[in-house]
A protein has these predicted regions:
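ABC ATPase nucleotide-binding domains
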Residues: 56, 95-257
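Helix-to-loop junction immediately C-terminal to a conserved catalytic motif
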Residues: 75
Length: 382
């Protein structure tokens, strides 16, 4: 019995030490081997990641990938089937949503139409029995933070969509959460308002130095706002990194296709590696050497990922070096032009060029030369 008790004390001490170390390392949220099943469907499959204190972290992926389930698990609205979730070094699985140091902003906001702005913002404080004087001060501070001074007595139905978003933000921030959870809060807004609210959210996050965990399926939104991004698919993490790392160095085919536009070229390694660049060749002998893959398949097969905007398009008569090709389709996209070209080897490549001379003078059927840097090609084996 004494041996068992001693063992239990050691386990408790080890867990407590790990939690203290997590908090000391500046980790706001630690997701440890979290799984969630709905019947036979795995919504989350062995997800592990750490979200740093004070960062804007986005969960990005298509519908049904598990990103909202993960967010709801952090907030306590879903219970993981397995694994653990720590916030500020403390496991929160046993805590109800209102007991966790988090607040959530939902896509549909859930504002109370029968309450004015001030009452909506202060609702959580009132439910906690906070001091009235202190609550009034904090509500006014929150309204000032989201630039809604003077709107306290307005009804929710008297506000624009953007103003309602700000009320929802103020209501969440007034409780001073350690982590703010945002479940696609901008999804229902039109484009211009969405862009404005992106800037507003980023400004707030930087001003407060708070930890924001943001769910979105919009890659542009995630790129513009995030310090780091976790790309998810089918309940699994595909890649975690900065926007630049995700875009420039995709971990696999899914990330390469889901984030941004890219030419995907089946190729084979043909030589060694020099300066981090591996020699590779596609069908017909087209050279697509690029950044060496982290591992090599037995047959040397790779996927060359070349972003549209990395390709330079020039008229053949310009006598610039490059791959000979013919423009088979030209699409006007406003600020840019999209050229679909067939190389002499028969490979189709798409390039995005600025809507400016000399590119805008190139039409369909034109002979062109395509060029790019090997450093702009990512060679993948996954």
């Amino acid at each position: 019995m004494g041996t068992l008790q001693g063992g239990l004390r050691k386990v408790v001490a080890r867990v407590s030490r790990e939690q203290q170390e997590t908090a000391a390392e500046g980790v706001a949220v630690s997701i440890r081997h979290v799984g969630k099943r709905f019947g036979s469907v795995a919504a989350l499959d062995d997800v592990s990641l750490e979200i740093r204190r004070g960062e804007f972290f986005s969960l990005l992926g298509p519908s049904g990938c598990g990103k909202t389930t993960l967010l709801r698990s952090i907030g306590g609205f879903e219970a993981p089937t397995e694994g653990d979730i720590l916030i500020e070094g403390r496991s929160v699985l046993h805590l109800a949503p209102y007991e966790r140091p988090t607040n959530m902003i939902f896509q549909h906001l859930a504002l109370f139409p029968h309450l004015d702005v001030r009452e909506n913002v202060g609702f959580g404080l009132r439910m906690k029995g906070a001091d009235r004087t202190d609550s009034a001060r904090r509500v006014e501070e929150a309204l000032r933070l989201v630039r809604l001074e003077g709107y306290g007595e307005r009804r929710v139905d008297q506000l624009s969509g953007g103003q309602r978003q700000r009320v929802a933000m103020a209501r969440a921030l007034v409780n001073d959460p350690a982590v703010l959870l945002l479940d696609e809060p901008l999804g229902a807004l039109d484009l211009q308002l969405r862009l404005q609210m992106q800037e507003e959210l980023r400004r707030l996050q930087r001003q407060l130095g708070a930890t924001f965990v943001f769910v979105t399926h919009d890659q542009g939104e995630a790129m513009a706002m995030s310090d780091r991004i976790a790309v998810m698919s089918a309940g699994r993490l595909q890649q975690v990194g900065t926007p630049a790392e995700i875009y420039e160095r995709p971990a696999n085919r899914f990330v390469a296709t889901f984030v941004g536009h890219a030419n995907l070229i089946e190729a084979r390694l043909t030589g060694g590696v020099a300066g981090g660049i591996a020699e590779a060749e596609a069908a017909g002998g087209l050279t697509v050497s690029g950044r060496a893959p982290t591992q090599r398949s037995a047959d040397g097969a790779v996927l060359a990922v070349l972003r549209y905007e990395k390709i330079r398009v020039r008229a053949a008569e310009a006598a610039e070096p490059g791959v000979p090709a013919t423009v088979i389709e030209r699409t006007y996209m406003g600020s840019s032009l999209r050229f679909t070209c067939r190389t002499a080897e028969g490979v189709l490549l798409t390039a995005d060029s600025p809507n400016a001379a000399p590119e805008r003078d190139i039409g369909e059927g034109a002979a062109v030369r395509l060029s790019w840097s090997p450093a702009d090609i990512a060679l993948l084996t996954d």
